[in-house]
Amino acid sequence: MNKTKMDSKVLDSILMKMLKTVDGSKDEVFQIGEQSRQQYEQLVEELKQIKQQVYEVIELGDKLEVQTRHARNRLSEVSRNFHRFSEEEIRNAYEKAHKLQVELTMIQQREKQLRERRDDLERRLLGLQEIIERSESLVSQITVVLNYLNQDLREVGLLLADAQAKQDFGLRIIEAQEEERKRVSREIHDGPAQMLANVMMRSELIERIFRDRGAEDGFQEIKNLRQNVRNALYEVRRIIYDLRPMALDDLGLIPTLRKYLYTTEEYNGKVKIHFQCIGETEDQRLAPQFEVALFRLAQEAVSNALKHSESEEITVKVEITKDFVILMIKDNGKGFDLKEAKEKKNKSFGLLGMKERVDLLEGTMTIDSKIGLGTFIMIKVPLSL
């Protein structure tokens, strides 16, 4: 008995050391990614300045070429007819031609240096982008490992007899959590974070605009900044809404789904989304677990269509009967090969998650998709769960 306790303590100690090492590695990878991201943003700003300088130098070089050509023509004319010009006029023509030629040579050298610097920055940005993507992927993978090592799956193990099934189930839950966290993180970084960074940069220019270009341009820049802040606020609200629509608790499935689809259509712009509801009233309510599950299923299906199908139209239909709720999502996109998608499970994770959610509700999900003919998904859930 004592030996068993001792073995358990030794194993716990080994596990804790391993977790600490893995967690430390995760922090180091994260720091590398953050440093690379900061350097990337600095280089992007420097690249913008270099490109502007290249443009200005090319413009100046073109002007100097014209002036140099005129000066050489003038010098040639003076040389051919030197008896008609004074010594001072000849000297001035020569000095001007020489000075312009020197300036042109220097500006051409400057252009060459700037172009080389621009090319070098673009190569470094590509390298940094690769480091950032790899660090994000590594952090995500390490987090999955940490969560799996930390998570107690004993209770789930009582429900799952097969050890392999238990492992797959646990990993799938953790991967789903990490995918969602990555999605939210990416949306915040690419949306509000970028917008606010832009606001910060532009706010630093306002004083210079007031000083150099006057109050009218300065006030216009403030107005533009205000619009940027509004856009950032809209993005934050949209992300919050995607995480958990508060209207779902207050209004129910149908009004919330209608609002979500309207907002999604407005946000994406190019895709037309139609919504139809059969056999319901606006204030009809379902049990909370049905409302949340059906909303998430519709959200996932629409999100998949927007990301992958390249469709121009999406139709969402909800039919509520006495015993069932039927959810149908159809798009006119490029479709996909169902057999191939099932074989590549890592590439059909969204559909796999939808299938598992439907199974929990004891429902059925059928998918009909053909390449070039779009996709049709029908989900049928019994209300007697």
From Swiss-Prot:
Activity modulation notes: Regulated via serine phosphorylation of its input domain. Phosphotransfer from DegS to DegU is stimulated by phosphorylation on Ser-76 and by DegQ.
Domain Histidine kinase stretches: 183-385
Effect after changing A193V: Retains its autophosphorylation activity, but cannot phosphorylate DegU
Keywords: ATP-binding, Coiled coil, Cytoplasm, Hydrolase, Kinase, Nucleotide-binding, Phosphoprotein, Protein phosphatase, Transferase, Two-component regulatory system
Modified residues (Phosphohistidine): H189
Enzyme nomenclature, EC number: 2.7.13.3, 3.1.3.-
Coiled coil start-end: 31-141
SMART domains: HATPase_c
Modifications made to the protein after synthesis: Autophosphorylated. Phosphorylated in vitro at Ser-76 by the serine/threonine-protein kinase YbdM, which stimulates the phosphate transfer to DegU.
Name of one Pfam family that matches: HATPase_c
GO molecular function: ATP binding; phosphoprotein phosphatase activity; phosphorelay sensor kinase activity; protein dimerization activity; protein kinase activity
Modified residues annotated as Phosphoserine in this record: S76
Subcellular locations according to the entry: Cytoplasm
Protein name: Signal transduction histidine-protein kinase/phosphatase DegS
Encoding gene per record: degS
